[in-house]
Regions:
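A charged, aromatic-enriched C-terminal amphipathic alpha-helix characteristic of glycosyltransferases
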Residues: 322-353
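Active-site proximal beta-strand in glycosyltransferases
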Residues: 87-111
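Acidic donor-binding loop of glycosyltransferase active sites
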Residues: 138, 254-268, 279-282
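Donor nucleotide-sugar binding/catalytic pocket of nucleotide-sugar-dependent glycosyltransferases
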Residues: 102, 120-123, 131-173
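Conserved nucleotide-sugar donor-binding subdomain of glycosyltransferases
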Residues: 13-72, 78-81, 113-136
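Conserved catalytic-core segment of nucleotide-activated headgroup transferases in glycan assembly
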Residues: 163-255
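Short hydrophobic beta-strand element within catalytic cores of glycosyltransferases
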Residues: 272-276, 282-286
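Conserved acidic donor-binding segment of nucleotide-sugar-dependent glycosyltransferases
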Residues: 297-308, 316-321
Length: 356
C-alpha cells in the first residue's frame, strides 16, 4: 500500500520528519521571497511620477487636434497628465484622476525597509509635478468624495473639482443567488499593478499563516495574469495559491466564493469590490480597499486591517452561511441605490452641463 515510501526503521518518526521538512521548506521560501527580492522598489511608481517627455509627433498631433473646435477636451490617467500643458486656453479641459499618484507613492514608501534621500527627493518632485500639471486643467474629476477632499486640500479651488464615480454594469446580479462557501477564496487583479501584487504577497505571507494556525483549510484563487518568478516562489510558500489566469465569465466564477480585497495601496474606486457585488459574492476588505465606496462593516462587507483581524474575518464569514447571504444581498441593494449605471451617467452629464 505504501509503494512510494522507502523502507525505514521507524515509519511514524519518518513521516513526522517529512512534515517538519515540508514546513521548514515553506518557511525558507517565505524568507527568500520577503528579504531577497526588493519587490517594492522594483514596481513602485515613484520613479515614473515625474515628467517624461512625450513622443514629439504625438505631442504635435494632440496640439493640432485639440484646436479643432471642441467644447470639452477630457484627458484620463496619470501617464498623460502632462497633456494639459498642450491644450488651448479657449476650451474647457478636464483631467479624470483615477488614482492620486502622490497618495499612492506615500502608501508604497511606507513598505520600504528604509527611505533614501533620493527617494524623498523623487517623491517631492513628483508631488510638485502632479500639483502643477493639475493646475493646467480647468476642471478635475475624481471617482470618490474621499479623493475630492484630498485634492481640495492639495490644489484648492473646490468649485473645479468634481466627483463622478465609474459606471458599474449591473449585469444580472439581481437574478443571481448567493452560493455560500466554506473554503473558496478569490482575488481579482493583475500582477502588473503593484497594489495587487502587494495584496497577494501580504495575504500569502501574513494572512494565510494566521488561517492555517487556526486550522482553516482553503483555496486562494487569483484571477488575472500572474507569471513572474516572484509569484512562483510565492506559490511554494503558500500552496493554497492557485493562479487561474483569464476567466471567460468573471461574475459566474466569483459567485460561490468569498472575494478578498487585502489592498493597502492607492486611491480611487476599487473595481474588484464592485465586481464582487455584481457577482453576488460576499467580500472581506481593508479600509483602504473600500475607501470612497459607501459600504460599511457588518452591513455590506467585513472590514479588517491587520493580518490577524483579516484572517479572523475570513474564518468567521466562511463559517456563517447566513452572514454570507446577508452581506452579499445588502451590498447589491446598496450598489443599485447609489451606483446604478443610469445614475452614474446622469451624474457625469451633470458635470459636463455645469462646465458648459
Amino acid at each position: 500500500e505504501q509503494m512510494n515510501e522507502p523502507e525505514t526503521r521507524h515509519p511514524y518518526y519518518y513521516k513526522w520528519l517529512k512534515k517538519i521538512a515540508s514546513s521548514a521548506t515553506r518557511k525558507m521560501h517565505r524568507q527568500l521571497f520577503a528579504y531577497n527580492k526588493d519587490v517594492v522598489r522594483r514596481d513602485m511608481t515613484l520613479t515614473s511620477s515625474i515628467f517624461e517627455p512625450l513622443p514629439s509627433k504625438y505631442a504635435e498631433y494632440i496640439s493640432t487636434v485639440s484646436r479643432s473646435g471642441f467644447d470639452i477636451i477630457q484627458v484620463e490617467f496619470y501617464p498623460l497628465i502632462s497633456l494639459g500643458y498642450l491644450l488651448p486656453e479657449g476650451v474647457q479641459t478636464i483631467f479624470v484622476h483615477h488614482e492620486l499618484r502622490y497618495i499612492r507613492n506615500e502608501n508604497e514608501m511606507t513598505f520600504l525597509d528604509r527611505v533614501t534621500d533620493e527617494e524623498r527627493m523623487l517623491y517631492r518632485i513628483g508631488k510638485d509635478f502632479e500639483h502643477s500639471a493639475l493646475q493646467t486643467y480647468k476642471h478635475v474629476i475624481v471617482l470618490t468624495e474621499v479623493d475630492r477632499q484630498i485634492l481640495i486640500d492639495f490644489i484648492g479651488e473646490e468649485n473645479r473639482i468634481h466627483v463622478s464615480p465609474a459606471v458599474v454594469p449591473m449585469t444580472d446580479a439581481c437574478d443571481k443567488q448567493v452560493v455560500p462557501t466554506g473554503f473558496r477564496l478569490t482575488f481579482v487583479g493583475s500582477e502588473g499593478h503593484y497594489p495587487n501584487l502587494d495584496a497577494v504577497v501580504w495575504f500569502c505571507q501574513k494572512i494565510a499563516p494566521c488561517l492555517r494556525s487556526q486550522g482553516f483549510h482553503f483555496t486562494f484563487q487569483v484571477v488575472g495574469p500572474w507569471k513572474s518568478s516572484y509569484v512562483r516562489e510565492l506559490q511554494m510558500s503558500c500552496p493554497e495559491l492557485e493562479l487561474v489566469g483569464y476567466v471567460e465569465d468573471l461574475h459566474n466564477f466569483l459567485n460561490g466564493s468569498i472575494v478578498l480585497v487585502p489592498i493597502r495601496i492607492g486611491s480611487g474606486m476599487r473595481m474588484k469590490i464592485l465586481d464582487a457585488v455584481s457577482s453576488k459574492a460576499p467580500f472581506v476588505t481593508t479600509t483602504k480597499g473600500v475607501e470612497g465606496i459607501n459600504f460599511h462593516h457588518e452591513e455590506e462587507c467585513l472590514i479588517a486591517d491587520s493580518a490577524l483581524e483579516f484572517a479572523s474575518a475570513v474564518i468567521r464569514l466562511a463559517g456563517d452561511q447566513d452572514l454570507q447571504v446577508k452581506l452579499a444581498n445588502q451590498a447589491v441593494e446598496q450598489l443599485q441605490k447609489l451606483y446604478s449605471p443610469q445614475k452614474m451617467l446622469d451624474r457625469r452629464l451633470a458635470v459636463y452641463n455645469q462646465i458648459l
